[in-house]
């Protein structure tokens, strides 16, 4: 068998902070949106989280044990906590690599899902470890809408969504047909429309509105490219929008790599068969059934997409019967399509390396990762990542769409027009890492079948922050110390100092962001910078304690990374799976502490607390929708 040869780059010089950044506000905007601000329709944050410490002092939770299964433990906890609630078990439960089982349950009313009412239970050693809850606790409607049937028909709901959100979808000839794929009682697919990338869908669900009231809604799904929306429109009047979820996550920056941060910092090299045999058992160029002489395999399929459309299978991608994917590229080449082979190869390489690393750190088939053939390892297959290089639907940006497990993720990488010649985001591995991390966090938070759990303002901000953090952690070099600062977006944006307000730094003068800073922000990338700054503090505390592995993947001892860098990444990933749907900063902090308790027995508790407390997320920190309270306190045993 011929070895796969991928042209890629190795970093030779770290990128340092270059004084005070000068953010470009245009790059902090969302990518489409037209005249409608979708942020105004974000769902509220109403989740509660009981961490492992609070469970230890909760007699009802402690008393629940089962000799049957961890699913029974979860069901019994819900019945004990909310005895009058009706619910169903979501079919995406699994046991993580840290030994913690994750079960997700959805509240129902009259057999209809309450779409944002979730209960997640984490079970370890047959006992409740921690849990999150956003179930509706108010008065349940007495009348069953399926009997009375006084709600608007689904076509009216679709037209109401298109009109209210100004979507580019034509609905004059729309009709609704019963959907055979959904579990919902009233689930339809809309035929006869145009303008969407696939047929819109509709389903009758309840929704907890921002004011806390329960409302019957039509959930209308529309994929219009830059936005893949779930819109909740009032089922009675077919006019009022009560909430919107967007599967697409935007980025306004480019960042770091394993090999090269940007083309100015090193030379491309040739790698032979670079995959990890455990994470990618079929290699990168096979799905277990077919071996492809191109940039296609079990984890991803990479191609150009100059039209910006939804079709990809027949798009251009480089072919090589001898599997030598070596193509010329230099920053002087123009136009971008003159080096499209090199661009596609670089994107394919970076996405696959990250897939393999995340697999080692626990993002496996059971957890909802992105693979076409899951090889009987759990989860749902048929969902590699569609990787579009030089996508024609936009510029100066990138995005990632994360539908539920079993449907492909979609990454769109754009060219950047902020320099001459234009630059290609696929050569910035940090952009790819950030975007792919949206897929990671959306699949883990709330479970693989629920991609709606990072849609509130603060949780959406953390979604951006995790992308920044993972890319920064991967970017660390052998000579770096806690005094090393990193800026964001300098090469692609052609902007000295990057596109964030502050570089990532452990120096509070260089980066003064703290928890209460979030009170000033209403934009997810700004909020995400605060969250990533906190994680950067935790990262260096654990590196100082355990050292730093500068290799491309961690060394594990009993499933625990032996160094501080990969340990922090592992705890952050495990915390995503523990936390409730749409968490706030305090709950996500507690989930990371719980992740350390589950993985190491709490060995790093004080280092984690110190990192968060330095930036006001200490023991006394409190979340309130209108005002956050900061605290620099740590537990007494850590003082």
UniProtKB/Swiss-Prot annotation:
GO cellular component: a single term: extracellular region
InterPro entries found in the cross-reference section: FTP_domain (IPR011096), Fungal_virulence_M36 (IPR050371), Peptidase_M36 (IPR001842), Peptidase_M4/M1_CTD_sf (IPR027268)
Required cofactor names: Zn(2+)
Pfam family name, one: Peptidase_M36
Molecular-function GO term, any one: metalloendopeptidase activity
UniProt subcellular location: Secreted
Residues of the signal peptide: 1-19
Catalytic site: 435
Function: Secreted metalloproteinase that allows assimilation of proteinaceous substrates and probably acts as a virulence factor.
UniProt cross-references to PANTHER family, sorted A to Z: EXTRACELLULAR METALLOPROTEINASE MEP
Protein name (Swiss-Prot/TrEMBL): Extracellular metalloproteinase 9
Species whose genome carries this gene: Coccidioides posadasii (strain C735)
């Amino acid at each position: 068998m011929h070895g796969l040869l991928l042209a890629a780059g190795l970093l030779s010089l770290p990128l340092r902070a270059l004084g005070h950044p000068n953010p470009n506000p245009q790059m902090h905007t969302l990518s489409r949106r037209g005249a409608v601000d979708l942020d105004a329709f974000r769902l509220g944050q109403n989740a509660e989280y009981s961490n492992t410490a609070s469970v230890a002092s909760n007699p009802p939770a402690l008393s629940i044990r089962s000799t049957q299964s961890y699913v029974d433990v979860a069901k019994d906890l819900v019945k004990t906590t909310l005895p009058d609630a009706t619910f169903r078990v979501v079919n995406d439960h699994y046991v993580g690599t840290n030994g913690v089982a994750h079960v997700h349950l959805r509240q129902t009313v009259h057999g209809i899902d309450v779409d944002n009412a979730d209960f997640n239970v984490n079970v370890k050693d047959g006992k409740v470890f921690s849990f999150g809850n956003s179930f509706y606790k108010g008065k349940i409607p007495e009348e069953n809408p399926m009997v009375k049937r006084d709600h608007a028909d689904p076509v009216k709901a679709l037209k109401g969504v298109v009109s209210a959100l100004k979507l580019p979808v034509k609905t004059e000839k729309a009709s609704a047909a019963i959907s055979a794929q959904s579990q919902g009682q009233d689930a339809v697919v809309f035929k006869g429309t145009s303008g969407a990338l696939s047929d819109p869908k509709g389903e009758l669900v309840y929704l907890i509105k921002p004011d806390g009231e329960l409302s019957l809604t039509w959930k209308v799904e529309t994929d219009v490219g830059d936005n893949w929306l779930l819109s909740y429109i009032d089922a009675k009047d077919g006019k009022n929008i009560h909430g919107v979820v967007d599967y697409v996550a935007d980025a306004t920056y480019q960042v770091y790599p394993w090999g090269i941060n940007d083309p100015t910092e090193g030379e491309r090299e040739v790698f032979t068969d670079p995959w990890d045999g455990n994470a990618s058992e079929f290699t990168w160029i096979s799905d277990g059934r077919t071996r492809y002489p191109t940039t296609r395999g079990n984890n991803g399929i990479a191609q150009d997409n100059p039209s910006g459309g939804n079709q990809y299978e027949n798009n251009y991608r480089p072919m090589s019967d001898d599997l030598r994917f070596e193509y010329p590229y230099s920053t002087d080449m123009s136009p971008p399509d003159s080096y499209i082979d090199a661009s596609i190869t670089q994107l394919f390489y970076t996405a696959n390396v990250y897939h393999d690393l995340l697999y080692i750190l626990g993002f496996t088939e059971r957890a909802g990762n992105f693979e076409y053939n899951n090889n009987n390892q759990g989860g749902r297959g048929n969902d590699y990542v569609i990787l579009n290089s030089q996508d024609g639907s936009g510029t100066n940006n990138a995005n990632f769409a994360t539908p539920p497990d079993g449907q492909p993720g979609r990454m769109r990488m754009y060219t950047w027009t902020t320099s001459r010649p234009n630059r290609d985001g696929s050569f910035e591995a940090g952009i790819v890492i950030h975007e792919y991390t949206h897929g990671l966090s959306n699949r883990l938070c709330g479970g693989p079948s629920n991609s709606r759990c990072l849609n509130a303002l603060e949780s959406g901000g953390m979604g951006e922050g995790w992308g920044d953090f993972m890319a920064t952690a991967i970017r660390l070099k052998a000579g770096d110390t806690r005094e090393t600062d990193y800026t964001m977006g300098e090469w692609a944006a052609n902007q000295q100092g990057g596109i964030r307000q502050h570089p990532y730094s452990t120096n509070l003068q260089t980066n003064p962001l703290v928890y209460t800073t979030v009170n000033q922000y209403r934009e997810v990338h700004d909020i995400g910078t605060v969250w990533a700054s906190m994680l950067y503090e935790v990262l260096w505390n654990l590196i100082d304690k355990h050292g730093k592995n500068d290799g491309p993947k961690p060394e594990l001892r009993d499933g625990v990374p032996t160094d501080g860098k990969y340990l922090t990444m592992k705890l952050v990933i495990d915390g995503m799976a523990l936390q409730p749907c749409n968490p706030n900063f305090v709950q996500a902090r507690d989930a990371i502490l719980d992740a350390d308790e589950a993985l190491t027995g709490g060995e790093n508790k004080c280092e984690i607390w110190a990192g968060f407390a330095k930036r006001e997320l200490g023991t006394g920190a409190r979340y309130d929708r209108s005002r956050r309270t900061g605290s620099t306190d740590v537990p007494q045993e850590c003082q």
